[in-house]
């Protein structure tokens, strides 16, 4: 049966003469229709190598759908990896709530899935987009593949709403792509149905692809050779308000204590994060506040930095592959492998705690090297191919 839909297919699958006058075709009996749904920059980074791997296979027809949750930042990532979206739901509105995002995503995806009839929907992580896409697929009895499955803090409200999102996705997914053995254990203990595959984390695939080119990161006024640069990223909802004030104060103390350091802080676009950090740090001569870096710039910054202070999950996974210690600006983490493996330390948002641990690494070369040389527990850059193999196995192709 030949169906005319907007899935992307490798041209060698069908006789080109049969495609004349038609937009895009796939042969349903030969190709598995896979829909990747994403909305945020972390999803784009972690799904990009997976999408590229599926698009290079003759067995799959792919569709890339954006919800529009982080349009500009997603577009940057897509360009870096040479990808284009097939659909954009454009759901974002000013001052919308989590309910608004979920409602509009569900409505848009319900209509879209009925139109394109994917045989499997692949989502990543724990965003509202991922949850809504999984739920929309479940409502139409479409199998769901969950990339980065099995992360847990065991506190339903921390992080919020991510912990609930990923638990709920796990209850309805048929394919669980777990990055580590601990994630596999979490899924097994929770009694999920479906197949669990330990694949490693796809962010390592993305990181190694970009890092090979040694991407530049030119920051006006920042001399990378003059300072030990501390790279920081802060965005999590749990750190809004007083915790942000404490984080900013700790950064000032570190800069005061170590005159050979500088702070590079790409600011999140959310004013709730952006404004207090600008007020606290904006006047310091060794603080460099920038707009969000695109992914290649971020990788270049990690490569050149000495130490990372971040509440980002991706940073906890990426930095160890580049030999950079991470201080996690949270009280809990769903990536405890980084802590037990010695590549990261939980420092929370207490001023004294952040300052003390950072000072130890900046003053003690042995302590620094112990973290910098620890083995990354999140994989070796082959996760995307392992995911493709698992989907092939699921469909027995």
Predicted regions and their residues:
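A short, histidine- and acid-enriched strand-loop-helix "catalytic/donor-clamping" loop
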Residues: 146-160, 174
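Leloir-type glycosyltransferase catalytic cores
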Residues: 182, 345-397
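A donor-sugar binding/catalytic signature common to diverse glycosyltransferases
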Residues: 123-124, 146, 176, 300-339
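N-terminal subdomain of nucleotide-sugar transferases
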Residues: 26-68
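An aromatic- and histidine-rich active-site surface loop
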Residues: 122-140
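Donor-nucleotide binding loops and adjacent catalytic segments primarily
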Residues: 72-77, 96, 214-304
């Amino acid at each position: 049966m030949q169906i005319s839909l907007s899935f992307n297919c490798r041209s060698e699958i069908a006789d080109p003469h049969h495609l004349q006058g038609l937009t895009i075709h796939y042969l349903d009996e030969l190709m598995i229709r896979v829909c990747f749904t994403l909305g945020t920059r972390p999803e784009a980074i972690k799904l990009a190598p997976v999408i590229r791997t599926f698009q290079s296979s003759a067995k799959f027809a792919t569709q890339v759908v954006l919800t529009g949750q982080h349009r500009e930042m997603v577009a940057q990532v897509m360009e870096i990896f040479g990808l284009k979206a097939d659909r954009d739901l454009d759901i974002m509105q000013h001052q919308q709530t989590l309910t608004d995002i979920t409602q509009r995503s569900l409505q848009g995806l319900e209509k879209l899935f009925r139109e394109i009839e994917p045989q499997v929907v692949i989502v990543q992580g724990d965003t509202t987009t991922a949850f809504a896409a999984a739920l929309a697929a479940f409502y139409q009895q479409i199998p769901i593949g969950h990339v980065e499955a099995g992360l847990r803090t065991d506190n339903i409200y921390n992080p919020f709403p991510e912990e609930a999102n990923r638990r709920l996705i796990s209850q309805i997914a048929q394919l669980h792509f777990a990055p580590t053995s601990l994630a596999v254990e979490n899924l097994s203990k929770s009694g999920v149905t479906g197949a669990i595959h330990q694949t490693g984390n796809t962010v390592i695939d993305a990181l190694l692809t970009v890092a090979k080119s040694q991407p530049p990161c030119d920051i006006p006024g920042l001399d990378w050779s003059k300072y030990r640069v501390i790279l920081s990223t802060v965005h999590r909802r749990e750190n809004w308000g007083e915790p942000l004030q404490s984080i900013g104060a700790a950064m000032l103390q570190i800069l005061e204590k170590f005159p050979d350091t500088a702070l590079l802080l790409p600011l999140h676009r959310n004013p709730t994060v952006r404004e207090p950090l600008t007020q606290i740090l904006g006047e310091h001569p060794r603080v460099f506040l920038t707009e969000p870096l695109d992914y290649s710039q971020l990788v270049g910054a990690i490569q050149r930095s000495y130490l990372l202070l971040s509440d980002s999950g991706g940073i906890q996974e990426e930095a160890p592959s580049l030999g950079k210690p991470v201080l996690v600006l949270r009280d809990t983490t769903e990536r405890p492998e980084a802590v037990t493996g010695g590549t990261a330390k939980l420092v929370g948002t207490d001023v004294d705690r952040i300052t003390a641990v950072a000072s130890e690494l900046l003053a003690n070369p042995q302590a620094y090297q112990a973290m910098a040389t620890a083995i990354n527990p999140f994989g070796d850059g082959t996760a995307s191919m392992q995911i493709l193999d698992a989907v092939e196995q699921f469909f027995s192709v």
